[in-house]
């Protein structure tokens, strides 16, 4: 362990890999609400947070569990399609709460082009939330719709149905054939839009 008068112990959250304080300061200087996106292996969570000296205040939040509970999502809740739908949901919630713009905060997640955290951003932007971004960071549309999953599932089923049922058991037990994920994605997307905008002709 380092010793001596020049050695400074990093803040606890920095040591635990939870907060990049240099990056956080830059975000706070924008004085805009933050669209905070975090992910785990099986879920994503998004929040609109505003800075408060006594503690950050959460305006609205959304969790991928809501996609299952409120909109009938049957796909995986940690993939790109569900991340986009979560972004759409948090975007509409933010607009309803009077939030028109925000700045993206992905914490310590690496800013990898096309990653699921940027699928959340894409959904929020499509809902009408103004967040500075570059179009190049978004996942391709076919990945957002889950077409890559559907194509892989179709090929795997033809090659090894036992492995297909094992790998996509989570989909099948919910009554969704993974080959039909893009259609299911569009159905759930339409439900979210209808809830906040009303039925579209």
From Swiss-Prot:
Q: List UniProt keywords, sorted A-Z.
A: Ribonucleoprotein, Ribosomal protein, RNA-binding, rRNA-binding
The record's gene field reads rpl18
NCBIfam families per record: PRK08569.1
**CDD domains (alphabetical):** Ribosomal_L18_L5e (cd00432)
Q: What family does the Swiss-Prot or TrEMBL record give for this protein?
A: Belongs to the universal ribosomal protein uL18 family.
| Entries under Gene3D superfamilies matching the protein | 3.30.420.100
DNA-binding: is it a keyword of this entry? no
* Name by which UniProt lists this protein: Large ribosomal subunit protein uL18
Which species is listed as the source? Thermococcus gammatolerans (strain DSM 15229 / JCM 11827 / EJ3)
